[in-house]
């Protein structure tokens, strides 16, 4: 499917929030919007998930106003996954309508809450099209490492590989964020060590598994290291908001050349 391209709008800074299902994308969207608003910046939220029922924030722009997931499922006799695929592809054809709403609101920051199933957004051409054609002066992506999933070193490597794959697909500067820090307790220290000392992570893998799983995990790890994987993983609590100041600073380095919102 070919989609109509539109001209860029200057001034707007766009933040995509991606991650595995249940990693806390919508909660972080809500917290980040609240943070910007409290500190004097005009932020708006775009919901890109056509199948979501309840959200912890008020949408400024909502794709559910443009496509009806349930109607498509009934009209074409599709299952839930098939309907989500078709609906997500249809969203790209509504880019002019979505952009007009964004232009009318004219925010400083647009926070984009991406679909729960990341493959529908990151690996289909419609998702890449939306990333490229939402008009914005600067864009970045926040990828969420679900703290509940990555307490195991093998799982950590798997999610790190996914994060790298998403960065490749979206072609955006990416900030990696660790969510649910309030739920993982003392394991937080180990996870943060893995991100700064890959030999520590490799030792943890060897203590957990052996054989083919060990070989595959360490080979992936070394490949990520060659690609410059070692980087800061910012811990965030979506419950308390702890860590948001560090996240905003990281966003400012990308979007505002280091100039932070007033706090």
Go through the PLM ranges and name each one:
Residues 119-218, 224-226:
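Conserved catalytic-core segment of NTP-binding enzymes
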Residues 24, 239-255:
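Conserved GTPase G-domain signal focused on the G5
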Residues 224-239:
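Beta-strand-loop-alpha "switch" segments that mediate conformational coupling across diverse proteins
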Residues 50-52, 116, 182-185, 240:
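Short, glycine/acidic-enriched loop or turn micro-motifs at the edges of active sites
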Residues 2-23, 27-129, 135-140:
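Nucleotide-state-sensitive switch-loop elements of NTP-binding domains
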Residues 1-14, 38, 73, 77, ...:
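Intrinsic disorder/low-complexity signal
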Residues 17-18, 47, 111-114, 142-148, ...:
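Conserved beta-strand segments of the P-loop GTPase G domain that flank and frequently precede/overlap
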Residues 254-262:
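The C-terminal output helix
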């Amino acid at each position: 499917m070919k989609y109509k391209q539109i001209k860029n709008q200057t001034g707007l800074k766009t933040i995509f929030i991606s991650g595995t299902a249940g990693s806390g994308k919508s909660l972080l969207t809500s917290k980040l919007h609240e943070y910007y608003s409290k500190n004097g910046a005009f932020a708006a939220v775009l919901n890109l998930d056509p199948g979501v029922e309840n959200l912890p924030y008020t949408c400024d722009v909502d794709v559910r106003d443009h496509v009806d997931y349930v109607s498509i499922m009934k009209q074409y006799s599709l299952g839930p996954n098939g309907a989500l695929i078709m609906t997500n592809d249809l969203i790209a054809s509504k880019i002019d309508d979505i952009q007009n709403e964004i232009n009318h609101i004219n925010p400083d920051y647009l926070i984009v809450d991406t679909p729960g199933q990341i493959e529908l957004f990151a690996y289909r051409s419609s998702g890449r099209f939306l990333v490229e054609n939402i008009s914005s002066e600067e864009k970045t992506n926040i990828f969420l490492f679900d703290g509940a999933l990555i307490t195991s070193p093998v799982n950590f490597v798997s999610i790190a590989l996914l994060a790298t794959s998403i960065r490749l697909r979206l072609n955006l500067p990416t900030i990696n964020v660790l969510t649910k820090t309030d739920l993982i307790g003392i394991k937080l220290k180990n996870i943060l060590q893995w991100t700064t000392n890959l030999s520590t992570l490799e030792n943890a893998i060897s203590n957990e598994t052996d054989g083919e799983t060990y070989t595959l995990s360490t080979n992936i790890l070394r490949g990520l290291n060659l690609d410059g994987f070692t980087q800061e993983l910012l811990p965030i609590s979506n419950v308390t908001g702890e860590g948001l100041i560090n996240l905003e600073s990281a966003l400012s380095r990308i979007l505002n050349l280091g100039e932070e919102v007033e706090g």
